[in-house]
Amino acid sequence: MTAKVKDHPPLWGFGTTKTFKIPIEHLDFKYIENCSDVKQLEKILCVLRSGEEGYYPELTEFCEKRLTGLAPRSRALRKDKPAATASSFSAEEWEKIDSDLKSWVSEIKREENTRHFHDPEKHPGVEDPLPPVRGSNSCPRGGKETSSKSKTAKKRIPRDYAEWDKFDVEKECSKIDEDYKEKTVINNKAHLSKIETKIDTAGLTEKEKNFLANREKGKGNEAFYSGDYEEAVMYYTRSLSALPTATAYNNRAQAEIKLQRWSSALEDCEKALELEPGNIKALLRRATTYKHQNKFLEAVDDLRKVLQAEPDNDLAKKTLSEVERELKNSEPASELQTKGKRMVIEEVENSGDEGGKGDEDDHEDDGVDMAAMGNIQKKLMVRSQGGRRSRRARTPMPGAEQQEGQPETGTASTSDNHDLEERRAADSPGDLKSRGNELFRGGQFAEAAVQYSGAIAQLEPTGSENADELSILYSNRAACYLKEGNCRGCIQDCDRALELQPFAVKPLLRRAMAYETLEQYRSAYVDYITVLKIDCRIQLASDSVNRITRILTELDGPKWRERLPPIPAVPASEPLRVWHPAAETPDQDPCPNSCTPTITDEKMFQALKEEGNQLVKDKNYKDAISKYNECLKINSKACAIYTNRALCYLKLGQFEEAKLDCDKALQIDSKNVKASYRLELAQKGLENCRERVADPSQVVLLSPDSSEAARHLDTKNDTAPPSRERERRRIEIQEVDDSSDEEPERPAEASAVEEGWSAERAGKIEVCKPRNAYEFGQVLSTISARKDEEACAQLLVFTAPQDLPVLLSNKLEGDMLLLIMQSLKSHLVAKDPSLVCKHLLYLSKAERFEMMLALTSKDQKEQMAQLFDDLSDAQADCLTAEDIQALRRQYVL
């Protein structure tokens, strides 16, 4: 038996190491000597070397020797060696190494000198033919030293505290942006002027020329994708100077088309077709140049060739349809041009035909959720501007269907500006809006904003007659500004759109995005919340609210809502008006005169109510009553106003007025919980308990969510005499948020009324048998707070002694222990000493008993000793002196 104990380690070990979890007993000479596991020895050696369990040099050395004997080539035996230096070698070895390095350096220099490309440092007179690396901050080589000197000469002096108080963040940021734009423009121009259009290819092989041409073409592609078409043209020219290819000509033609250099683009397309006849891209781009040069027949020929090769080419089909339409419209114009007469476009006013009507879609912003926003169909009704044009006015001029700003050919080219002004004057707001929508969809936001501005300028004098149309135009122009990054212009247009059409969703969303871009998160939060009030299904607004909530919590802390601007109240009819518009009839007025006062009264009512609620929160009850009085003048059937005013009367002690308001509220809504509860408080304040209309039990039955009524019901039951046979029925009360139409209830709203009867509530505690540990803990905590020894003794009588450790759980405190001992001594020792003995026995088995016993003072232990003395004096058949003495030892007395 003893041998087995020696072979096996004891049950209680000394733990393990942090690394490898090796038992501490294995870090021993005897174990290492007998161990033949190489992996185990390597782990032990690693732990010993780390020193996490202490430093034992002799044990470490012994482990190394043991591991050397078992595995001489083990990795654990390897030791780190520092990098070799000159002192690590002999003089001969170091001289040989040094000579080898020098010979290698000289050989590399000779190899560089034999290369074809010259070294600019050795030949300063010869310029480097290769362009510099592309970048916004590239500058001449000669200016590097001067710039570095100027930078080192400047010293930045830190600002003092008084200057920081006057620091305007937005102004400084705008200055930085302006400086950055100016520097960027200057650097780009300087960079373009330094790029040479030709590459010296003398002496290069075809492979090297191909490599240089592809490299320059790649640079041109990068410049083209970034929108720098001038730079792209230069790099494509450099590529063509190295090796002419059809691809480079095609690419340069596309860049020239972007720059509207039609003749240069046409030449490049023809050269590409000379190198590769039938090239699809060259034919397409030559057709584009023909189209803009009004050579429609040539464009049709090229496009038909493309469609013969690729019948499914969508771009060719679309361009061909446009060219055919232009060709068809230009036929009468060509006849008129032969006569040499100019047709003046005039607009006929006061015509019976409303030719200016146009059904256009309000374009969508990319940031708006498509499913939630949708295209809102609006009819742009142009009054006194649209009319029937004469047949002469309907006859289009040459190139009338072209894009704005394109030059026209033929006899009309002598006065292009005059024609452009006439054409713009003839365009109706509907045409301008539709053209702006097309430009917006094509990504030309600045041009779209110009079109919307023209439509706004025509409709602005009409004022409120076209408020809806103006609101849409302002909203569209705001979307263009938002895309361009002009957030302040976007905010101004959205404000104007909301003045014309309050609570429109799109202006609110776009203004919120602009505020968020400017980091004005509080204003953005208010706009997003307003959008969600109108339509809670908009996912973009919901996600943005969650994101901005996290940002405001980090910035302002948990009280960030107090710093928000006031959130406007959305009328109940507003969502229906915005999202479900009725069928529009041009003959009817958009809003009759009779509806204006109703909307005004509703807004005024809501504003007065919110002001009153805010005054209640600020405890300014008299001013709140005046606000509620004004609300009742507008709407005398608002039940919430009566209950709110009753609350103010209760706070001011005017119980009679509060009772009258509650009666009126109950006449409107007989099941109103707050009115019933506040009527109860008013009647109790009047000491008229016999004439109560509603008691708290009825309130709880009406609304189980009313926490205050349930709490008052518990107080009432506590003060009532307890019934002997019937056990009380318990009601679960869960506290939830109140409705949004009234200000939230506060637990202290009846504090002024409850002061009068606080003495009645301080009666004896009714104790019943607890069902679980939670109820036992609640009752015992209440008894301990009141120091009620009689109630504690009654609770111990109801409690079985063997259940006491479970019911106490880990909630035993020092004052509870002393109260239990005192209640046993005062009320139970003389009546039932055996029950006291059992309670003392099981009390010693409760959690935290030993800790509480160690924390008791000397006086408290003397009181406990008196309990045991009384228990010894009591005569009980089941108690002996040995039992009481054993209990004394458990209580350390």
From Swiss-Prot:
Listed Gene3D superfamilies: Tetratricopeptide repeat domain
InterPro entries, A to Z: CiliaryAsmbly_MitoImport (IPR051982), RPAP3-like_C (IPR025986), TPR-like_helical_dom_sf (IPR011990), TPR_rpt (IPR019734)
Localization of this protein: Cytoplasm; Dynein axonemal particle
Protein purpose: May play a role in the cytoplasmic assembly of the ciliary dynein arms. Binds GTP and has GTPase activity. Plays a role in fertilization.
Keyword terms: Cytoplasm, Fertilization, GTP-binding, Hydrolase, Nucleotide-binding, Phosphoprotein, Repeat, TPR repeat
GO MF: GTP binding; hydrolase activity
Protein name per Swiss-Prot or TrEMBL: Sperm-associated antigen 1
Superkingdom per UniProt: Eukaryota
Intervals holding TPR repeats: 213-246, 247-279, 280-313, 429-463, 471-504, 506-538, 605-638, 639-672
Cellular component terms (Gene Ontology): cytoplasm; cytosol; dynein axonemal particle; protein folding chaperone complex
Ranges of compositional bias, category Polar residues: 403-415
Gene: Spag1
Tissue-wise expression: Testis and sperm.
Remaining remarks: Antibodies against SPAG1 interfere with fertilization.
Compositionally biased intervals (Acidic residues): 734-744
